Amino acid sequence: MLIQILTIHPAIVAPVFRESILGRACEAGILDLRVVNIRDFALSKHQQTDDYPYGGGAGLLMKPEPVFGAVRWAAGRAPAGARPPRVILMDPQGRRFDQRYAEELAREDHLILICGRYEGFDERIRALATDEISIGDYVLMGGEVAALVVVEAVTRLIPGVLGDLESSVAESHTSGLLEGPQYTRPAEFEGMRVPEILTSGNHGAIARWRREQALRRTFERRPDLLQSADLTPEERRLVEAWRTRQS
């Protein structure tokens, strides 16, 4: 997969692509992560990428010309035989990003993520986008951090990026439930012991315990997720029993 992040601040993004799992996946040829400097496509000699809004108002807006130029250039770098890229505008007005959206994007060949700065975009820039994504109901100083969230969530789903594919499947939200409690050595620490079931060696019982713990944690912390979670009839009865005791 080719992922290009378009930004006026490449130094925010580039170091992340060289580190840890992302860096190793790039070295192995599993991922191709690139940063495109929008300033390189500015038309003025001072590489201006912002200007005052028509009609007045506070702040500055991203100019359309550099962004159009950067996106068109990035789209021309698509891998041979790749489908047209998904062009994603990082925008607090966009669709809320979640695990299912990450799974959808992980099936693509080529992603282009546009990071804004200043007070926002010239409205005409939206014509470039196939998607507009928000990572939450708050405002950041720019789209770079949000774009990196998308990159992390998407790339970890690509085969070979994580050493253990099962770990990506078992994580919170992938199953529709939050992940239950986990423990490592020592078996006892400051009076807190690891649950005996986890040291029993009974893998079937351990799997059932983990599923129930995940269900309980989701019920306690994110009950909204249970509406769309894939639960068995027995699990739904268990949730109803918890609700009854809670009321």
UniProtKB/Swiss-Prot annotation:
It is an enzyme of class 2 (transferase). It catalyses: guanosine(37) in tRNA + S-adenosyl-L-methionine = N(1)-methylguanosine(37) in tRNA + S-adenosyl-L-homocysteine + H(+). One of its GO terms (biological process) is tRNA N1-guanine methylation. The keyword Methyltransferase applies. GO terms for cellular component: cytosol. Pfam families: tRNA_m1G_MT (PF01746). It is found in: Cytoplasm. Keywords: Cytoplasm, Methyltransferase, S-adenosyl-L-methionine, Transferase, tRNA processing. Its main location: cytoplasm. One of its GO terms (molecular function) is tRNA (guanine(37)-N1)-methyltransferase activity. Belongs to the RNA methyltransferase TrmD family. Homodimer. Specifically methylates guanosine-37 in various tRNAs. This is tRNA (guanine-N(1)-)-methyltransferase. It comes from Symbiobacterium thermophilum (strain DSM 24528 / JCM 14929 / IAM 14863 / T).
